[in-house]
Amino acid sequence: MSDTRRRVKVYTLNEDRQWDDRGTGHVSSTYVEELKGMSLLVRAESDGSLLLESKINPNTAYQKQQDTLIVWSEAENYDLALSFQEKAGCDEIWEKICQVQGKDPSVEVTQDLIDESEEERFEEMPETSHLIDLPTCELNKLEEIADLVTSVLSSPIRREKLALALENEGYIKKLLQLFQACENLENTEGLHHLYEIIRGILFLNKATLFEVMFSDECIMDVVGCLEYDPALAQPKRHREFLTKTAKFKEVIPITDSELRQKIHQTYRVQYIQDIILPTPSVFEENFLSTLTSFIFFNKVEIVSMLQEDEKFLSEVFAQLTDEATDDDKRRELVNFFKEFCAFSQTLQPQNRDAFFKTLAKLGILPALEIVMGMDDLQVRSAATDIFSYLVEFSPSMVREFVMQEAQQSDDDILLINVVIEQMICDTDPELGGAVQLMGLLRTLIDPENMLATTNKTEKSEFLNFFYNHCMHVLTAPLLTNTSEDKCEKDFFLKHYRYSWSFICTPSHSHSHSTPSSSISQDNIVGSNKNNTICPDNYQTAQLLALILELLTFCVEHHTYHIKNYIMNKDLLRRVLVLMNSKHTFLALCALRFMRRIIGLKDEFYNRYITKGNLFEPVINALLDNGTRYNLLNSAVIELFEFIRVEDIKSLTAHIVENFYKALESIEYVQTFKGLKTKYEQEKDRQNQKLNSVPSILRSNRFRRDAKALEEDEEMWFNEDEEEEGKAVVAPVEKPKPEDDFPDNYEKFMETKKAKESEDKENLPKRTSPGGFKFTFSHSASAANGTNSKSVVAQIPPATSNGSSSKTTNLPTSVTATKGSLVGLVDYPDDEEEDEEEESSPRKRPRLGS
């Protein structure tokens, strides 16, 4: 037997009854010593590796479908298929299979799997009864035909024999002629029988019968037969829907008649499977496997034919980006691409890779960048869906495009910034589009799917790009909504307007595109008609929660990039302002952000938190929560419990020294007493170490170490104030949206800095950096509805042994009004510290009170 090689694709059927592409190669039939018999071998055309080695078993049932497919099952729930490029190759391999099994190549199935009882009955049949005798195709025989078709469905052998009889006698076309006669005569009984007959023929699961039934000549009559379900009082109107309601739109004329016919056929067959046929029972689920395969291979063929027609795709892209294209036409073009990408999901990874590379080569991403910035909501939605297909399949391709784009475009029109601003400006009250876009951004900035090669690292390059060009756009709503500086708020509002008008100008988009109501200032999430941010607007809170979720992801997965950004922007302080939001879910998002930072157990972050006194808004929120033991209460307790269990010494000392008096009344958990115990144990250990050192060395070393540490920390944390724009951890280029500030803002900042310098000189000196003031609202009175009173807990300053006093500027707290989204903590040096009387805090009510 000659070793004939033919080009094929190898498919396997997965658990979801979908065909998985295992690769393309050349098939041969040859004797394999290890398998002790003739076998089918497929070697990959790319590298010659073995894709398939399958012994031709004498008892295996092979089926030939659609002239170019051979399908068989090797084991339970393991189906294989060979899809041939040429019919001649399929015929030759089919002959080899039939030769090994001793079967007639003219039939399209070698045999079928049967149970023992079926086999016994089959052996008892006379040899002359090879095919089933069909009744004559007449109106008065329809009931008999229906009974025959339904009776064979339980027997694989009889199903096969009936299929052969139907095929050989051209019976289906005769049945469809009877259908037309029954409709003309309004013969309801006959129409009900025809429904059972056609449905039964579909369940025969024969590709050759499908090719007849789904041909242009027959398919609408098949649909007509399936309208007359006896279980329904009135027939359905499926043909009316397919011919009148469902309109086939050629966005670009398709010149290939075979392609057009294939598209029509696939749509109608999919409609039959999804809409007309009832959901198969557990006993029928395998009856339509061939129908699923028929649709699958049709879709593969459609995508391949379109992909190979570069003239067609080039014309689609040209019209999509042409300024002269009207809105309706552009909407159709975008919807076509959306459907095209949806079809591509039937392809396997190798084929999808080629498909998306073709789209990328033709310019899909620049085209998306244009249409995503348009004012048509339907177009933007479809463009977002296409973008999601691209990101899901190849985030690296999208990242590579935006990094190249950054070299020749302004930040405002970068694709990722357009995506971010679409998220920010989502007009949906539930922010459905914003949630989808946030998920795409999360995929793009996820280091887990970034590539690393010997020449370059995608992770470092892309994250540098993202933090330099995009992060300021993402955090703009957060910084705006937590700012007490009117000028800063005005800048961000102006930035929104500028960005959208810039994107929609003719030089960067289409001449007809102008900032519409959907993307104008009036519809920035949470803004009102007076161009002011509504800080506790529910939609604003939802958006800020999404942004915080993304920033929390950055803290977990990025290293020095997000650390630099948090330090330079004092971002955690701004986030903790949201602890005072009336929306608990937003306060929890802010708390989760801080919890992730503390969870890293990074001393840089810990010193930043203690220096900025950033536990204060968290503790204020806990006390303001009163006796309500809800999710917020539990989340705050868990934060402090983590610090206790992990024994984070710097944070433990800070909490106990500064806040223990306010927290000691909380006794329903042992967290705070446990922190105090940890603190005292550590203090005892330090004292023991000091006592073991000679006094003169202890004095010198203590003085030197304390001073050095103090100076280092002051230098490190004030570095950003003294040297504007200098990175704290690593020299990453810092985003500077301030470059676009109006001149009057620059003058304002100069005046503000001058005033700050004066304030620093006029601040009262203290003997030690240890003293500070802690103001909080009494939780019990807040919970009981009474007026909250501010209570000041003065911690006595610690004195060093003979060391000179050092003037430091520590933050002074201000009690926030409940329900307003303002800062719980003033920024350092904003105003002189006011001396307040010392008093002790009231105890927090316990569970039993």
From Swiss-Prot:
GO cellular component: a single term: cytoplasm
- Record domain WH1: where: 1-100
Q: Which residues form the signal peptide?
A: none
Question: Which tissue types show expression of this protein?
Answer: Moderately expressed in tissues and specific brain regions examined.
Q: Where is the composition biased (Basic and acidic residues)?
A: 733-764
On the tree of life, the source organism's domain of life is Eukaryota
- Biased region (Polar residues) positions are 776-818
Q: Which GO terms describe its biological process?
A: DNA damage response; gluconeogenesis; positive regulation of gluconeogenesis; regulation of double-strand break repair
Q: Which is one GO molecular function term here?
A: protein phosphatase activator activity
Pfam families per UniProt: EVH1_PP4R3, PP4R3
Where are the annotated segments for Disordered?
Answer: 714-849
- Keywords from the named record: Cytoplasm, Cytoskeleton, Nucleus, Phosphoprotein
Q: Biased-composition ranges for Acidic residues?
A: 714-724, 827-838
Which compartments does it reside in? Cytoplasm; Cytoplasm, Cytoskeleton, Microtubule organizing center, Centrosome; Nucleus
Q: Which InterPro entries does this one have?
A: ARM-type_fold, EVH1_PP4R3, P4R3-like_central_dom, PH-like_dom_sf, PP4R3-like
Residues with the Phosphoserine modification? S117, S695, S840
Instruction: Explain the purpose of this protein.
Output: Regulatory subunit of serine/threonine-protein phosphatase 4 (PP4). May regulate the activity of PPP4C at centrosomal microtubule organizing centers.
Family membership noted in the UniProt record: Belongs to the SMEK family.
Quaternary arrangement and interactors, per the entry?
A: Serine/threonine-protein phosphatase 4 (PP4) occurs in different assemblies of the catalytic and one or more regulatory subunits. Component of the PP4 complex PPP4C-PPP4R2-PPP4R3B.
UniProt name for this protein: Serine/threonine-protein phosphatase 4 regulatory subunit 3B
Question: Which species does this protein come from?
Answer: Homo sapiens
Gene that encodes the chain: PPP4R3B
